[in-house]
Curated annotation (Swiss-Prot):
Catalyzes the non-heme iron(II)-dependent oxidative cleavage of 2,3-dihydroxyphenylpropionic acid and 2,3-dihydroxicinnamic acid into 2-hydroxy-6-ketononadienedioate and 2-hydroxy-6-ketononatrienedioate, respectively. Homotetramer. It comes from the Bacteria. Its cofactor is Fe(2+). Its EC number is 1.13.11.16. The active site is at 115 (proton donor), 179 (proton acceptor). This is 2,3-dihydroxyphenylpropionate/2,3-dihydroxicinnamic acid 1,2-dioxygenase. CDD domains: MhpB_like (cd07365). Pathway: Aromatic compound metabolism; 3-phenylpropanoate degradation. HAMAP family: MhpB (MF_01653). GO terms for biological process: 3-phenylpropionate catabolic process. It comes from Mycolicibacterium smegmatis (strain ATCC 700084 / mc(2)155).
């Protein structure tokens, strides 16, 4: 059961007009380095920890955690649309193992996943369907949210389960870091958006295009200092990366949701995916990190980071 890890930020703006060539070139080079790491490891299975942006999970029933025994990409922001090669047997066995370990997780036999799941797969493999996958959703947007410690417990339990597999497994965490994009909330969403985030009302092509244009404009305004969105926090991002690099995951148990929002923004809670991924790897002992990339990227409305890791022994 050899394990490896790759955590990375995601952004719909990687596939949209707006970001400078200099920024995209730097991120492309960093992703290429991570891709080489993944190619050398040559995983037989990929376990993803990722959020959703009201494309597959909605307030009508919002689990804190969910594992997919079948899944499909919704194709948002130019990402892959269609079924993913989910290993249903392993996903079911993982869920049973989690329940037995005291971590409650929901199951979806028809999980819809968006760019938060699909973009890292496409960037790391060139094709979202290149490897069998077990997708695990972590609610990181729809408040109220559970404590960060529960994401660490989830990851540790998944890591314990992975020890039973005779496969090379890549653990992927997707999201963050400091990050406050324009996401509708129960308190602020206009009627059409409220219907979508609660009931999952489908978007028309015109609505999808309008949302895409709104994201492009929001990023432009943010990058030019003309936005009410919370500023990026590179110091906070680097302190978090240092915790991951040094394996001090238990330090994060004291990070309250209020603290995370105040330091990193409303969508900084996507760091839960990194916490779970690193906890899964740490369940097998000490690890060492590589591919130390970080760039505060206002054009992406994100502190964009990449880390890889392998067990120390």
């Amino acid at each position: 059961m050899p394990l490896a890890l790759c955590c990375m930020s995601h952004s719909p703006l990687l596939n949209l007009p707006g970001p400078s060539a200099e920024l995209l070139d730097q991120i492309t080079d960093a992703i290429a380095d991570a891709r080489k790491f993944v190619e050398q490891f040559d995983p037989e299975l990929v376990v993803t920890f990722s959020p959703d942006h009201y494309n597959g999970f909605f307030y009508r029933l919002m689990p804190p955690f969910c594992i997919g025994t079948a899944a499909a990409g919704v194709g948002d922001y130019g990402t892959y649309q269609g079924p993913l090669p989910v290993d249903a047997d392993i996903a079911n066995a993982c869920a049973e193992s989690l329940w037995e370990s005291g971590v409650d997780i929901a199951i979806s036999t028809a999980m819809d996943v968006d760019h938060g799941t699909v973009q890292p797969l496409q960037e790391l493999f060139g094709d979202a369907t290149a490897r069998p996958v077990v997708p695990i959703f972590i609610n990181s947007v729809a408040t109220p949210l559970g404590p960060l410690s529960r994401s660490r417990a989830l990851g540790a339990a998944v890591g314990t389960f992975l020890a039973t597999l005779d496969k090379r497994v890549l653990i992927v965490g997707s999201g963050g870091l400091s990050h406050d994009p324009p996401v509708p909330t129960l308190a602020t969403a206009p009627p059409a958006a409220l219907d979508r985030i609660v009931h999952g009302a489908p978007m028309t092509p015109e609505q999808r295009m309008a949302r895409q244009e709104a994201v492009i404009k929001a990023a432009h305004d943010f990058a030019h200092g003309q936005s009410p969105l919370r500023s990026l926090n590179p110091d906070w991002d680097r302190s978090l990366l240092e915790i991951f690099d040094e394996g001090r995951l238990s330090d994060l148990d004291g990070w309250t949701n209020t603290f995370i929002t105040g330091e990193g923004g409303n969508s900084a809670h996507e760091i839960r995916t990194w916490v779970a991924a690193f906890a899964a790897l740490a369940a097998h002992g000490e690890y060492q990190t590589g591919n130390h990339f970080y760039r505060a990227a206002p054009e992406l409305i994100a502190g964009f980071a990449i880390r890889t890791a392998v067990p120390s022994t």
